[in-house]
Every structure is written in structure tokens, then in C-alpha cells.
């Protein structure tokens, strides 16, 4: 917002500024626009309110000026009058219904503005019209916050007298008194304290009044707070005390006051830093540091990372402060948790003068730091040649010759070729840093240029990787091996080919601009190119492969260095072979995968065949499409790459990949390549077209594009499912609408006869279902829409529990309930525990449906019992479901629950529904027989708990087996005990002549043997029983009739001791539906 010239304003505004009432009246009589707006949407009334001329203001209002007009920042004339302290103008505006609660863009009301601008009279006029004086602006500040911020004692007093809250916090939890302390408004602070303000209040980050006063150097406020007895060492959320803050901000007077009042000079914060650490690092902390040292601060106190105050001074090269610390006993070679001493830190940040001071005071230049590096490693790594020279001391080596060795030893006391823990010497670091002056200093000091690190890399590898031309030339000239491979088989040429990627990130000053980056980047690329060119000119072999089979051409392609790639292709004798080779991956694939369109263009212009495939059958075009690189797709298609080549696993083409990933632009390019008329309908291994994949992944733009380009909307995959089926599953309304707009057939069926309406119902997509039903009416209103198993959409909605879809289907065609499979929607709902849809069906269609039967004669109550659905059972019985109804096998819901071991359902049917436990099925099994046959002990005990009837306990089925036989055979000890205690007979024999005791035998032969043994034991059973028992035994005994086959049971099964013994009681397995 600039300053506007008065001469550029409308005549009415000029007259107002000139306070010329008659001119204003004259202009208004001439029909001058009274609500004319300037560039910031301010009206003449804003101007009059700002000037405060009541006569003009009233004239404008009476002439129809909008009293609540807002400018671009939503300020009204009332805001303007309050800001200018024009109380008469404000009174007049209020008299003419100006909105006293109007807010500007910062949510500030006229009260906020008046309080901030010391307009006491205006505030007195506004307050009676407000419900509260504690209304907050967007930052959470009240009028009292603004008044305190302005330091106006009279305004503060007025607001307090009118009920302003002392403890109201803004959005950073700062109270008005925080601002008084921070801005040094001592009298205001005293008033607030006298009115009861909390002098120990904290904001959201834990800052107290003492912290804020210390930060801004408000010495008088600090003294007053200390006199009030505030806690001097109270930490904020970061553990910093007021002394920490004062030292960090360089407020030496405040720091002095705090120290004199007894502040702890050695109190650490959350990271272990003391005030001395802060004083050592801050811009203006020199006097604070001296004060702390003179008052007993521990100069060797280490933070949680092991940094001493001397480390902190070394970061920013605080020379004078480092001298003070050293003179006061700071440990020169104190190491942090990484092993770095202050000398390492000074070398890392290039502070030569500080290095001199540290070395003069005995700092160990051979001390190992991070990764076992010397300070010299760090100095040369970051390219500080002056520091390098200083650390090399005299810069000259002398030889110590003995009978055992002939080593170069530095005068500083360490071997210059000593490696770090990764095997890298100082020369490696210098080569990586790229400062040729450092490199020359080390070489002249005897550094070994052939030394390899743990990765097998020489300094030349590092120089090449960083694209450092001068360092590369220096090392090669000095005799470095140009084709030496590292542990991965990479030569310096491999790294040079990808040098722009491997280049170490350099530090820039904080005020660097983006405009400086482009020339710098261009300069680096040129240097990297010259480096590569130099290596090639000096014998580097471009045909050498690393251990994975990649040449320098592969590296250049993978990292997108077009100039490097062109140079390598030009210099390589077998370049075409390298480019076309797909072992392990071709350069074309690498460039496409990484989205390097310039490199890709170079390769495309070199190659004849762009459709070479990798081991998975993917072409470069497929990879570019899959990765969403439209530029690469454009390059490849313009050079003739095919969009129809399929990869091996799913048989996807680039079109499939583009559609599945939603890469619309790439898809457009592929279609426009015009390889085939039906290119959009190409199918994968499952028969899916790109349209189907686009819809499955909800890519609407791709769907529209494919349909516009001729993709067949009704194309079906190998399971007969179309794009419309997929749209119904995903629920994408836009995709579905696009398909219907292109005449997709709504009632198309898959291999199971299911339509998209079935899928929408099953997935619960209400709006999709509504759209499909409407479309189906116009297609074939008589189609019953049942699948090949007879299930309708209503079956699926009920089974899946989608109430809204079921409601729509019932509204659409309530008679659909009776169509299709007799296993009704109600059966489906209760068997899947969908009580809400079950209740909806009963309420909509009446109680008559609760006793409907499926093909096996089973009612919904059978289904609920099978699923152990108690709520379903309750619902059905509430609507007169028949509790003892039987299916075609003669089984009741209780029998169904017993057979499947559903204890809760059995308990409910027995105790609540009073189900009949004596009902027999077609094989004369009771519920007790069925529970025992499947080993459901709890169910059997529940049934036994309801009866003492010997007729039921000793009831035999068509195989003459009692519950005791079956319980014994299945090892149900507690059930056997319960049966025996209720009088179950132990001598009854089944069809095979076996008693319950013999039923415990693992197989028939064992049972027969056990029977023979028992027959010879005393006491004997009654004579009749013996003869009957012996007859049956001999008839079936394996000894007496080895070749006799076991007779069939009444239900057609074989011997009850066969592998599937449960068939002896005529069960038909689990509930098949």
C-alpha cells in the first residue's frame, strides 16, 4: 500500500481533506458519487472520519453515505475515527447506527483500534454499547493487550475499570503483562501487578515475564520483577532460564543484574547448554561471556552432545571469546560425543585465526574426531586452504630414516597418510572437497595419491565423482592410475560420467539468491564435462564395466548428464553395443526410468531399435510411462517407440501403465502415436483394457480421454466383467457417468451372471446404484436382474448390510424380494449378522417373510442359529418366527445351533425361546445327538441341563446309538458323566452290538477285542443280555468272520468306526448356503 497523491483523488475527497464544507455540499448537489472508491476501496466517509470534521461527516451521512462501508482490509469509518482519536466523529457515526462490532481482516473491532491508539474518549463511548470488553482479534489479543502494548497507563486503567480481564491469553498464551514486560512499560506493569496479574505466568513455550524482559533488555522491568521475588532460574519449555536468554540476546546489563541476584550460571537447558554456551555463540555475547566467567561459570561444562563453550565459540570463530575461555582453563582438546575437539570445529568452519590460537595453546592436531578424522581432514574436505596450511604447520616434511622404516612424518606429529575409519586419507578428503590448493599442499607434503580407502577408491575416484577438473588434472599429472577400479568395479570414469549427482553439497551464505544458482550450476556442468574429457584424453577406457556390468555410458544415462553421454558415445568404439545391451539394463532404460529426457533424446537418436526389453519384458517407453515422465514419453514416441509392446508378467503395454497410474498426458501421447486403430482396446493377460484400469484406480481424466479416443465401453475381460462393473465397485461417480454417456450397457453380465447393479449393491455405493437402476429402467425394465445362482442385488445389499442401498432397492421394486433364489435376502442378512438390514426387510415386507423357506426347507431362523446371531434370533422371534420349524432333514434351529457348537444361540433358544429338545430329524437324531457328534461339549451340557427325561437321555437314532455312545466315542468326559448321573444306560448296544464303553475304542477291531475280553470277566450281565450281546458280537467279530463286511447303517454309511465316524448318525455336514 503506497502513499497516494491528493491531487489524484476525486474532487469530493479533495474537498474533504481541505475541510471545505461548502465545496462538499456543492459537489453533492452536482450528484457527485458519494460512495466513490479509491484504489483501496475507501469511501469519502472514510476520509471524513479520518479528518474528524463533524460537519462534513454529518453532511455525507445525511446525503446517503454508507456508514458501514469497508475498504480492502475491511476497515469501516468507525475504525478510522477511533484510530484518529476523533471522539466527536465517532459519536456521530455511532448515532447513525455504525456497527460497533465491525471487524477488519485481523478481526479487530473499533475498540481494539481505539485502545491501540490511546483514544480514551472513544473507548468510553464504545464500551457501553458492547456486551464484553474482552473480545479477541485473530491473534487472540483483547483491547487490554493492545492498550498495554501501546504503554498507555490511562487506557489500561480505564479498561480494567470497565471489566477487562487481566489473565486473558492470546493464541500464544501471552497475557497483557507479558507485553508490558517485553516492551519495558514499567508503570503499566506495576498497575497490572497491583490489580492482581500473575507475575509467574507463562506463555505457550514457557516464557515468563522475566524471560521476555531479559530478551529485550528491559533492565528496569527485570529489577522490579526481581524485587517482587519471581523465580530467577525458572526454565521455559526448552529449559532456558532468563540468564540463558539474556546471554543469547547479548543483553549484558540484564545478565549482570541476574548474576548479582544469584542466578545459576551453570544451569543447563534441555540440551545441556549453559548460559556460557549461549554467550560463546551469540553475536553480541562477548561481555556476557566475560561476566559469566568472572562469576564462576564452568568453562568445561559439556552439553548432552559433549560440546563445551569452546566448541560453541569455534563454530562461529569467536576469537576473543575463545581466548577468554582458554585463559580461564577451558580444556583445549575437549571432545564431543563424535570425538570432535574445538580444533576440528574451527577447521570445519574455516576459522584460521582461531586455529592459530588453539594450536598456540597446545591443541592436538593429531586428535581423531568424527569417523576418526583429523582436523586436517575437515579443513581440506570443506576447502579451507589457509586452515590446511596452518594445520600442516611448517608445511614441510622431514624424513625419519631407520633400519626398519622410511616414513614421512609431519612436524605436527602425525602421518599425513593416516586413514579415517573408512580408510580415507586427507588426500581423499581434499579430492572430494575440490580445492586444488589444498590438494597441492598435501601432495607437496608427501601425501600418497595411490592409497585406497575401504571401498577401494583412490583420491582420483573422489575428484572425478565431484567433477573437479583441476583436482583431476593435478592427480593424473602426479601419477594417479586412471583406470583403477574400486571394490564395485567402478573406475574414475564411471564416477565422472555421473559427477553432477555425486558432487558434494557446498555451503552457501544465507543471502544467496536463486538467480545465482543457474550460472553456478552451468559452471559446474562445464567443469564436470572438462573432467570427463580430460580422463578420456588421458587413457580412460570407456568400455570397462563395473561388477554389475555397467559402463560409463550407463552411468551417464542413469544420472542424466547429456553432455557427458554425448562425449562418451563419441569416444567409445563399441558404444552401440553398450547402448543396445540389456544386460543388466540398457542405458535407454536407465535414462527413461529416471526421467532424463535430454539423455534419452541423445540415446534415441543413436539407436535403431527403441523397443529393446529388460529382463521383465519392459521397454524404455513402458518405464517412462509408469514413472509419469511425459517429456520422456514424448521423446520416445516421436522417435518411433511402440506403445503396444507387452511386458512379460501381466502383459501390460505402456497404455495400461499410463491408465493405471493416471498419467493422462502420457496416455494422450501414446494414443496419438497412431500405431493401430483399436490401440485403446489392447488387452492384458486378464483381458483388461486401459479403460478398465483407469476406472479401477479412479483416474477420471484418463477415462474421459480413452472414451473420446474410441475405447469400447462394453469390452469385457476374461471373466466377463466390463469397465462398468469396475466403476460400480470403486464407486467413482464421474467415471460411471462417463461410461453411461458413451452408452455402456447397464445389464451386462459377468461369468456368474452378475451385473454392475449387483456390484454396486454389494459395495454399498448408493448414488452409483441409483444411477444404474435409472439406466436399467430405460434399457430393459422387465429384466429381473438375478445372477446365475438366482441372487438379486437385494440379496447382496442385505448380506453386506448396506441399509441405504437396500432401502433404494425396496423403493425401486419391492417384489424383487420374491425373485430368484429362495434363500431370501432375509436369510442373507441374518446369516451375515446384518441385523439392521434384516430389521428393515421385516418392517418393509411384514412378518410373513420370517418363515419363508429356502431350497432345503430352512427358514431365516435356521440361518440365524447357524451364524450364532442372537440379535437376529430375537428379531425373528419377535415377529412370530416358528421356533421348532424343521427343514427337509427334520432339523430345527436348535439342532442347527447344536451341530455347529454355537453356545450362545443354543442357550437363547433353550432358555428364552423354549425350543423343543425332543424333536427328531430324519435319522432320529435329537439336538443332543448332534451336539455330541461334533464334540460340542458346552452345547450338550446346556441341553442336558434342561431335561431329566430318560426317554431323551437314552433315545437312540436310526443306528441305535444313544447320546452316550456318541459322547463316549468323541471323548466328551463331562458329557458322559452328566449322562451317567442322569441314568443313561451303559448296557444298550448299537447296530454293531457295541455298548457305550466299546464306543470309546479307537476302531472296530479294538472294540471287538475289548468286547471278547469283557465277555469273560465277572460279574456277568443277565443271561438274556449275555446271549444277545454274544450273538451280535460273534456276528460282527473280526476273529469269527474275518471276511465278513460291515453292514451298512440306516443312513447308508459304513461302520461307525471308520475314518468319518460322524456319518453314522446321518449328518449332512455344515450349512452349505
UniProtKB/Swiss-Prot annotation:
Instruction: State the signal peptide span.
Output: none
Can you say where the ANK repeats lie in this chain? 7-36, 40-69, 73-102, 106-135, 139-168, 172-201, 205-234, 238-267, 271-301, 305-334, 338-367, 371-400, 422-451, 455-484, 488-544, 548-578, 583-612, 616-645, 650-679, 686-715, 719-748, 752-781, 789-818, 821-851, 856-885, 889-919, 923-952, 959-988
Q: Cite the PROSITE patterns for this sequence.
A: ANK_REP_REGION (PS50297), ANK_REPEAT (PS50088)
InterPro entries linked to this entry: Ankyrin_rpt (IPR002110), Ankyrin_rpt-contain_sf (IPR036770)
Among SMART domains, the record links this protein to: ANK
| Top-level division of the source organism's lineage | Eukaryota
Single biological process term from Gene Ontology:
protein localization to ciliary inversin compartment
UniProt KW keywords: ANK repeat, Repeat
Q: Which cellular components does GO assign to this protein?
A: cilium
Protein role: Putative regulatory subunit of protein phosphatase 6 (PP6) that may be involved in the recognition of phosphoprotein substrates.
Q: How does it assemble?
A: Protein phosphatase 6 (PP6) holoenzyme is proposed to be a heterotrimeric complex formed by the catalytic subunit, a SAPS domain-containing subunit (PP6R) and an ankyrin repeat-domain containing regulatory subunit (ARS).
Return the protein name.
Serine/threonine-protein phosphatase 6 regulatory ankyrin repeat subunit C
- What species is given as this protein's source? Gallus gallus (Chicken)
Amino acid at each position: 500500500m503506497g502513499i497516494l497523491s491528493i491531487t489524484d483523488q476525486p474532487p469530493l475527497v479533495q474537498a474533504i481533506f481541505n475541510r471545505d464544507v461548502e465545496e462538499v455540499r456543492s459537489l453533492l448537489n452536482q450528484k457527485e458519487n458519494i460512495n466513490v472508491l479509491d484504489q483501496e476501496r475507501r469511501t469519502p466517509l472514510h476520509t471524513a472520519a479520518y479528518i474528524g470534521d463533524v460537519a462534513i461527516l454529518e453532511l455525507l451521512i445525511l446525503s446517503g453515505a454508507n456508514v458501514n462501508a469497508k475498504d480492502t482490509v475491511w476497515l469501516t469509518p468507525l475504525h478510522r475515527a477511533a484510530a484518529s482519536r476523533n471522539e466527536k466523529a465517532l459519536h456521530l457515526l455511532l448515532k447513525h447506527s455504525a456497527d460497533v462490532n465491525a471487524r477488519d481482516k485481523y478481526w479487530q473491532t473499533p475498540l481494539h483500534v481505539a485502545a491501540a491508539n490511546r483514544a480514551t474518549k472513544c473507548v468510553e463511548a464504545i464500551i457501553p454499547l458492547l456486551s464484553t470488553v474482552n473480545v479477541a482479534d485473530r491473534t487472540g489479543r483483547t483491547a487490554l493487550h493492545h492498550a498495554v502494548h501501546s504503554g498507555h497507563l490511562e487506557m489500561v486503567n480505564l479498561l480494567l475499570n470497565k471489566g477487562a480481564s487481566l489473565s486473558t491469553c492470546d493464541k500464544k498464551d501471552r497475557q497483557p503483562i507479558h507485553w508490558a514486560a517485553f516492551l519495558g512499560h514499567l508503570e503499566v506493569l506495576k498497575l497490572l501487578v497491583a490489580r492482581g496479574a500473575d507475575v509467574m505466568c507463562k506463555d505457550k513455550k514457557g516464557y515468563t515475564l522475566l524471560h521476555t524482559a531479559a530478551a529485550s533488555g528491559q533492565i528496569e522491568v527485570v529489577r522490579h520483577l526481581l524485587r517482587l521475588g519471581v523465580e530467577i532460574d525458572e526454565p521455559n519449555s526448552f529449559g532456558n532460564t532468563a540468564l540463558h536468554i539474556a546471554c543469547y540476546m547479548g543483553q549484558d546489563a540484564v545478565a549482570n543484574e541476574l548474576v548479582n541476584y544469584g542466578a545459576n550460571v551453570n544451569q543447563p537447558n534441555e540440551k545441556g547448554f549453559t548460559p556460557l554456551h549461549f554467550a560463546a555463540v551469540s553475536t553480541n555475547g562477548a561481555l556476557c561471556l566475560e561476566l559469566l566467567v568472572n562469576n564462576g561459570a564452568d568453562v568445561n561444562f559439556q552439553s548432552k552432545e559433549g560440546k563445551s563453550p569452546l566448541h560453541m565459540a569455534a563454530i562461529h570463530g569467536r576469537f576473543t571469546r575463545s581466548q577468554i575461555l582458554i585463559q580461564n582453563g577451558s580444556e583445549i582438546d575437549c571432545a564431543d560425543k563424535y570425538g570432535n575437539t574445538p580444533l576440528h570445529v574451527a577447521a570445519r568452519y574455516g576459522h584460521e585465526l582461531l586455529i592459530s590460537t588453539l594450536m598456540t595453546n597446545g591443541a592436538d592436531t593429531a586428535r581423531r574426531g568424527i569417523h576418526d578424522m583429523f582436523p586436517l581432514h575437515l579443513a581440506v574436505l570443506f576447502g579451507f586452504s589457509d586452515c590446511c596450511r596452518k594445520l600442516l604447520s611448517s608445511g614441510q616434511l622431514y624424513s625419519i630414516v631407520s633400519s626398519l622404516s622410511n616414513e614421512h612424518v609431519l612436524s605436527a606429529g602425525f602421518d599425513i597418510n593416516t586413514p579415517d575409519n573408512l580408510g580415507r586419507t586427507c588426500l581423499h578428503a581434499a579430492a572430494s572437497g575440490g580445492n586444488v590448493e589444498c590438494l597441492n599442499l598435501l601432495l607437496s607434503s608427501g601425501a600418497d595419491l595411490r592409497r585406497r580407502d575401504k571401498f577401494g577408491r583412490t583420491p582420483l575416484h573422489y575428484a572425478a565423482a565431484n567433477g573437479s577438473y583441476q583436482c583431476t588434472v593435478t592427480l593424473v599429472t602426479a601419477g594417479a592410475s586412471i583406470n583403477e577400479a574400486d571394490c564395485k568395479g567402478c573406475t574414475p570414469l564411471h564416477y565422472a560420467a555421473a559427477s553432477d549427482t555425486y558432487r558434494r553439497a557446498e555451503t552457501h551464505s544465507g543471502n544467496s539468491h536463486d538467480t545465482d544458482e543457474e550460472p553456478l550450476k552451468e559452471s559446474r556442468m562445464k567443469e564436470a564435462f572438462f573432467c570427463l574429457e580430460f580422463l578420456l584424453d588421458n587413457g580412460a577406457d570407456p568400455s570397462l564395466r563395473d561388477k554389475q556390468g555397467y559402463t560409463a555410458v550407463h552411468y551417464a544415462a542413469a544420472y542424466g548428464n547429456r553432455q557427458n553421454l554425448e562425449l562418451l558415445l563419441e569416444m567409445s568404439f563399441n558404444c552401440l553395443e553398450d547402448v543396445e545391451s540389456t544386460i543388466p539394463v540398457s542405458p535407454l532404460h536407465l535414462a527413461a526410468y529416471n526421467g532424463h529426457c535430454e539423455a534419452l533424446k541423445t540415446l534415441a537418436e543413436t539407436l535403431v531399435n527403441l523397443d529393446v526389453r529388460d529382463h521383465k519384458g519392459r521397454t524404455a517407453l513402458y518405464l517412462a510411462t509408469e514413472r509419469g515422465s511425459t517429456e520422456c514419453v514424448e521423446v520416445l514416441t516421436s522417435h518411433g517407440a511402440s506403445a503396444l509392446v507387452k511386458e512379460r508378467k501381466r502383459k501390460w503395454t505402456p497404455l495400461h501403465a499410463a491408465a493405471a497410474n493416471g498419467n493422462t498426458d502420457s496416455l494422450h501421447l501414446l494414443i496419438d502415436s497412431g500405431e493401430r486403430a483399436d490401440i485403446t482396446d489392447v488387452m492384458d493377460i486378464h483381458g483388461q483394457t486401459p479403460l478398465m484400469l483407469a476406472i479401477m484406480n479412479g483416474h477420471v481424466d484418463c477415462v474421459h480421454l480413452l472414451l473420446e479416443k474410441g475405447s469400447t465401453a462394453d469390452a469385457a475381460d476374461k471373466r466377463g466383467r466390463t469397465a462398468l462393473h469396475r466403476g460400480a465397485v470403486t464407486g467413482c461417480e464421474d467415471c460411471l457417468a462417463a461410461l453411461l454417456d458413451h452408452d455402456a450397457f447397464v445389464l451386462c453380465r459377468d461369468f456368474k451372471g452378475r451385473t454392475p447393479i449387483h456390484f454396486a449393491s454389494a459395495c454399498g455405493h448408493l448414488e452409483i446404484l441409483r444411477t444404474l437402476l435409472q439406466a436399467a429402467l430405460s434399457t430393459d425394465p422387465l429384466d429381473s436382474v438375478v445372477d446365475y445362482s438366482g441372487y438379486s442385488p437385494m440379496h447382496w445389499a442385505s448380506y453386506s448390510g448396506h441399509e441405504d442401498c437396500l432401502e433404494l432397492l425396496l423403493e425401486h421394486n419391492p417384489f424383487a424380494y420374491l425373485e430368484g433364489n429362495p434363500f431370501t435376502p432375509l436369510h442373507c442378512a441374518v446369516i451375515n449378522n446384518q441385523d439392521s438390514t434384516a430389521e428393515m426387510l421385516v418392517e418393509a415386507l411384514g412378518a410373513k417373510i420370517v418363515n419363508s423357506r429356502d431350497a432345503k426347507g430352512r427358514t431365516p431362523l435356521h440361518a440365524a442359529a447357524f451364524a450364532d446371531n442372537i440379535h437376529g434370533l430375537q428379531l425373528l422371534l419377535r415377529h412370530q418366527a416358528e421356533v421348532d420349524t424343521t427343514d427337509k432333514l427334520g432339523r430345527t434351529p436348535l439342532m442347527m445351533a447344536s451341530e455347529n457348537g454355537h453356545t450362545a444361540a443354543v442357550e437363547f433358544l433353550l432358555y428364552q425361546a423354549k425350543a423343543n429338545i425332543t424333536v427328531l430329524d430324519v435319522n432320529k437324531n435329537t439336538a443332543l445327538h448332534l451336539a455330541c457328534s461334533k464334540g460340542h461339549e458346552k452345547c450338550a451340557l446346556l441341553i442336558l441341563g434342561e431335561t431329566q427325561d430318560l426317554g431323551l437321555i437314552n433315545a437312540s437314532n436310526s443306528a441305535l446309538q444313544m447320546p452316550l455312545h456318541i459322547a463316549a466315542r468323541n471323548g466328551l468326559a463331562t458329557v458322559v458323566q452328566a449322562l451317567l448321573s442322569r441314568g443313561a444306560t451303559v448296557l444298550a448296544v448299537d447296530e454293531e452290538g457295541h455298548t457305550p464303553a466299546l464306543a470309546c475304542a479307537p476302531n472296530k477291531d479294538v472294540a471287538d477285542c475289548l468286547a471278547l475280553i469283557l465277555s469273560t470277566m465277572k460279574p456277568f450281565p443277565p443271561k438274556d443280555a449275555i446271549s444277545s450281546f454274544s450273538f451280535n458280537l460273534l456276528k460282527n467279530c473280526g476273529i469269527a468272520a474275518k471276511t465278513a463286511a460291515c453292514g451298512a447303517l440306516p443312513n447308508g454309511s459304513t461302520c461307525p468306526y471308520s475314518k468319518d465316524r460322524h456319518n453314522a448318525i446321518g449328518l449332512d455336514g455344515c450349512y452349505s448356503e
